[in-house]
UniProtKB/Swiss-Prot annotation:
Keyword Protein transport part of the UniProt annotation: yes
GO biological process, any: protein localization
Pfam families tied to this protein: Exo84_C, PH_EXO84, VPS51_Exo84_N
Protein name: Exocyst complex component EXO84
A cellular component annotation (GO) from this entry: transport vesicle
Assembly and oligomerization: Component of the exocyst complex.
Disordered: annotated span: 1-40, 399-439
Basic and acidic residues: compositionally biased ranges: 399-416
Keywords: Coiled coil, Cytoplasmic vesicle, Exocytosis, Protein transport, Transport
Location in or out of the cell: Cytoplasmic vesicle, Secretory vesicle
The organism's taxonomic lineage, starting at the top: Eukaryota, Fungi, Dikarya, Basidiomycota, Agaricomycotina
Protein family per UniProt: Belongs to the EXO84 family.
Role, per record: Involved in the secretory pathway as part of the exocyst complex which tethers secretory vesicles to the sites of exocytosis. Plays a role in both the assembly of the exocyst and the polarization of this complex to specific sites of the plasma membrane for exocytosis. Also involved in assembly of the spliceosome.
Amino acid sequence: MASLRRPSTAIPRGPASVQFDRGARPPLPNDNKQKRMSKVGEKIKKRLSMRYGGNESFSVPPPLPGASDFLTADPYGGLDIETPGEDLAASPFGLYGASDLKESSIQSSQPLDTQEHLVDESIGRRGAADATLEEEWNLEELSNEKVDAQAYVKKVLTGADEEEKRRFVAALMREKQANKKELQRTVFKHYAEFVAISKEISTLENDMLELKELLGQWKDLPQLMGMEDTLAPTLDRNGNLERRRTQRKSVFDLQNLYRNQLTQLWSIVEGSQKYLPVVAGRHLVFELHGVVELNPATYKPKQNVSIFLLNDVLLIAGKRRNKGGSTTSVGDEKDRDRGRMVAERCWNLIELGIVDVKDGGELVNVIKVHRGKEHCVYRTQKSDDKRALINAFRQISREANEKKRKDSEKEQERRKTMWLGDKNGNGTGNSGHPLSTIGPSMADSKDLRWIDEYGDELTMAIAIRDWEESVKLVEKGQALSKSIESNSSAHSLLVSRLEQLVPSLVSQISHDLSSSNLRKSSSARLISLLVRLDLADHARDSFLESRRELMFKRVRSIKCDGDVSIYINELAVVIFTIIRHTSDWYMNAFKENNMASGFVTWAKQQIETFADLFRRQMDAPNISESTVNECLHVTATQNRKLLRDVGLDFTFLLSSLLQPSSNPSDYPHSVFTSV
């Protein structure tokens, strides 16, 4: 490997045959000798302690404006080679390397001290150049963002020669490479932190966008409410609180806004005006489009609907699509009409319930709306739509319950004060005594407020579905009404309250009695409550009607696989079993003998229903006589097992109704007589 040290121009290299005739060395002064030894030794030590870097390639920057192109030459080219001056041109050291130098022509013409002085200057220049590579210029000023590059270069290179300019450029290149490596190390060191911060920034950006949307909605709310943007009170010139005109018109503007909402809904949904008349305070709370209605039994899609949730009702609107295509002349108008929404259902929110169906399999984003025995299933496109609809319904329910509670409290306060006398009255009584005293000197001089308290107790008992307590209160009220017949005002007030509350109690008990999941003990208890209210006939009709509906429900669940005899057998089992159980339940609930005729009439109707279904199966053209006889035998067998053995013998009725001949007065069929 070649040495990194360059040949010095001060010490010539040539053949050993070249000899210099120095002559006798004159004595040197002592001070010059000491100066020379100290200076040369210092330079040599400094030179030996220098570190030399590797071969680094530096790109050549463009020349400075107004300056010579000093970057094209080697940055280190002038550190060791000096142009010989006039005083060195004649010396062997100055002419070393010249093309016209001959070995024979080199002669020593300079004294020894002059030659040693030239060597010291060359060594000093090399040492100064190497020592100032890192210390000559302060490049830390360039790290300041506000530094003026032109001013800095002008300050540093003022009066500099070509050598200093080259050294400055080399220092800049080294600083550039060092900064580049430091930047790479910093990037690699903080890469994981950079990725984490980027994720946090993206999350924060989404949160800011959501906050921006919410702030926009909040900003539009005062305008929709007919209010000013600011809710802070304003003061007039005198410092008094100023009333805004918008406060006076806020209620009126809000009603106009609600009316405009309903008008727009009428124009969008055909037939909605019939369900949604203008009512004070009625407004649209939430609407959802693109909802798919599912079959409650199979969960198969039926149609696309739109849901409109108002503060008191729920409107379901389907889309009406014309089967026929539109002509070109009136195409635009018919296309607009095609797909128009039509109101299908409208439910009161008080009677309504929404159930969140848990996601599973293909059943995703499904809600179930039930009203009594009616059930509807809907599927939304997104889970957010489903959640928003359920939250809106719950919020409206809470507001309705809160409003109902406040109205109840106001009603109670009104009832407490409605019977108090007016202080400014016309002298009908003292201010401290009620106006509705029952007689001036009755033993019981209580006012009529107890009637209101009685009505509140009965209302509360009905609300919490305590039927036993409700019936006791009704019986108490009926007894009190008979005892106060002499006082027309109290009697009329009590009777009016009973007439108002008893129908509600009876309807709710009847609804529970008509349930298909009712047990024997529960039905007997409910029937006894209605009997205590002198509604035995109503209880009988409600109970028997519910049993008839249950029978038809069980009949519809029978599968018909083509074998008529099996179908008739299952039909007879279902109908005869329900008749038998109904007889047992009926006799357990109604103890009076005069109520038995009602059950017999009902049982006769069910036997006739069975006979009608039986004849429909037998009247088919492909039914053979053997099949008919087999069906008759099955019917007679089930009649004996389920009815006749427990005392319900309807053989005569079945024999006459199932007689194959056209004359029902013929003798009973042999099957019924033989079984």
